[in-house]
A protein has these predicted regions:
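Hydrophobic N-terminal alpha-helices or hydrophobic patches in metabolic proteins across all domains
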Residues: 1-187
Length: 187
């Protein structure tokens, strides 16, 4: 006969298990919609890549760089500083999966719905701005230190973006969700 504590830990009445199941199901649904509908049948993905390219171009030009942009193909565009090879920006670079990851956590974690309505878009906007700054930095690295581009693309900036998202989650749990949970426990 299984241990009662073990069974209680893995029952659907356990708040953590509910959160994991809700978040997992929601992420799977969003992933499938993105992969099999949005990416295939809409121009949303390409438009978002274009928005990142244009925003990166504005930031680099504001910093005094001469830039170039190339439409590589339907799913890939290049932005760079004149004299460099530039950086490719594709559907894996547009941060939509990061928006989903962040959003799923906020939606699935208990908290005041009113707080979720402003925190979710604010967090997504912050992740988007950070992603644009990531592409700006990668373009600068491709120009000045191209030998470090792959490492920074694969490790440094992935680490920074995921830590930023983790920080947004911690802020949510400590400042908003806990407040909501504590109020529920007092009533």
């Amino acid at each position: 006969m299984p241990n009662k504590g073990f069974m209680r830990a893995f029952s659907t009445s356990n708040a953590f298990i509910k959160f994991v199941l809700r978040a997992g199901a929601l992420y799977l649904i969003l992933y499938l919609i993105y992969q099999f509908v949005v990416k295939r049948y809409t121009l949303y993905d390409q438009g978002f890549i274009g928005w990142i390219i244009e925003s990166t171009d504005v930031v680099l030009r504001t910093m005094g760089y001469k830039t170039f942009k190339v439409l590589q193909d339907r799913d890939m565009q290049v932005i760079g500083i004149d004299g460099s090879n530039g950086v490719w920006v594709g559907s894996n670079c547009n941060a939509i999966t990061l928006f989903s990851l962040f959003g799923v956590f906020i939606i699935a974690y208990p908290g005041n719905q009113r707080d979720k309505w402003w925190y979710l878009p604010s967090g997504i906007l912050a992740i988007h701005v950070l992603n644009i700054l990531r592409v700006v930095a990668l373009a600068m690295i491709a120009n000045s230190y191209p030998q470090y581009l792959d490492f920074n693309h694969s490790y440094t900036f992935n680490f920074l973006i995921y830590m930023f998202i983790f920080g947004l989650w911690i802020l949510w749990v400590n400042k908003f969700a806990d407040k909501h949970i504590q109020k529920d426990e007092q009533n």
